[in-house]
């Protein structure tokens, strides 16, 4: 029984890796010709480049962790602010 589970796990890993490898060609930028011979060729290249950057330039939310931890870097002289420094009741 353990061999069957191991074989199924191995085959699923290989299937996932093969699917990921097939999509890797989509991540490559379009090939740039040595010389543009016509305006149409330049338009096609720029359209392909625009499509590439529209896919690759999308923000990936949640991949960088908690950005609030970085606020400590911008404080001068290590000063600390109280948690309730700006309570809404003070402005009413």
Swiss-Prot record:
GO molecular function, one term: hormone activity
Alphabetical keyword list: Amidation, Cleavage on pair of basic residues, Neuropeptide, Secreted, Signal
Keyword Signal attached: yes
Residues the record lists as Phenylalanine amide modifications: 61
Cellular component GO terms held in the UniProt record: extracellular region
Keyword presence, Signal: yes
Subcellular locations according to the entry: Secreted
Main location: secreted
Pfam families assigned: Hormone_3 (PF00159)
Tissue specificity annotation: Highly expressed in the abdominal ganglion, to lesser extent in the pleural-pedal ganglion and much lower in the cerebral ganglion.
Stretch forming the signal peptide: 1-21
Example GO BP: neuropeptide signaling pathway
Function description: May play a role in the regulation of viscermotor functions during egg laying.
Family: Belongs to the NPY family.
Name of the protein in its database record: Pro-neuropeptide Y
Organism: Aplysia californica
Gene: NPY
